Amino acid sequence: MFSFMNPGKSKPAKKGLKIIIVGCGKVGTTLVEQLSKEGHDIIIIDKNAKKVQEIANIYDIMGIVGNGASYSVQMDAGIEDTDLIISVTESDELNLLCCTVAKQVGDCAAIARVRTPDYSKEAGYLREKLGLAMIINPELEAAREAARILFLPSALEVNSFAHG
């Protein structure tokens, strides 16, 4: 396991949330970009050292190379005082395990990306039993949004209130 930080820069104390993002793919990188702009303290975890170093240098954040579901990796990332963990690796099972480990160790909110339809059907059960704040299926959400917009084709803007 290796940690990367942009050398030679002293970082001012951030006032936002401490957020761990597991997975440095497109979604993880986009989350880092958006959340770091909002002033949150971001730590990334991924097995790909090159990606971790690249993203850590671009956004001046801490990066850890390792398995995000590993207790020791999460401890190195500071899970005990983390506000939120978001797991967006390519593996649904790894995402669920990352969040489960985090919930057992720290008192943080946990969000897992789940793309398999079988798990998406059980999202409510998994969220409740694993104590997750949210389970997201991006493809399903995009399809729902498209259907909602197509249902009201002449609307300029479509907003949901309460639960839809």
Language model segments and positions:
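Cytosolic regulatory regions of ion transport systems
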Residues: 1-164
